[in-house]
Amino acid sequence: KLDYEIYVTNGVFRGLDADGEARFGEVNGLRGSKSGYVNDNYNESPGIVGRVTFSPFIGFEFGGSAYTCRYDENNENQLTIPALDFTYQRGPFEFLGEGAYAFIETDNFAEAAGIPGDMWGYYLEARYHFMPSLLKSWSPRIFTDNSTFTGCLRWDQVQTAGRDDNFERVHWGRNRLTPGLNYRYTEDTVIKLDYQ
């Protein structure tokens, strides 16, 4: 099975204002630059996003996606984020992951504001789906045939970039291991607990 999609959207990143205020950085990566305001077209440049997925057999899927747009108010610098992902499920076991790399174009004005040239990150996650029969017999209204628990363990690694106190360009790496437990009452209702 092969699926694909492509969209043209309003650009959603507000990375560099005309007065030199940068919103990309080492603390929150690209997150602080998302606009999300109604009718907000910061630099009147569209964003283009696309995705292709391929599933050679039931239970396995891999895909690639990309997003690109101008990120600065002067409409002179491009942000491009390609990503790869996969999901493999066999019985109650599931393994998935995703990796992305942000290519950030920087002219002299963007460099002077401290905009980094790149950032990247990935995660790998293992899941196990289960439902103890004791719980189903104890309370069949709460623990139905459609309900399930999922134990998960996720490894994240992210590298953001910015400037240090001496205004030297540096990269910061973050690693995180996150165990978690989810209870899904129905497909659309889930309670999640995790420890970071």
Q: What is each model feature region?
A:
Residues F60-Q196:
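Outer-membrane beta-barrel pore domains
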Residues K1-E61, S65-C69:
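Aromatic- and glycine-enriched pocket-lining scaffold segments that form the walls
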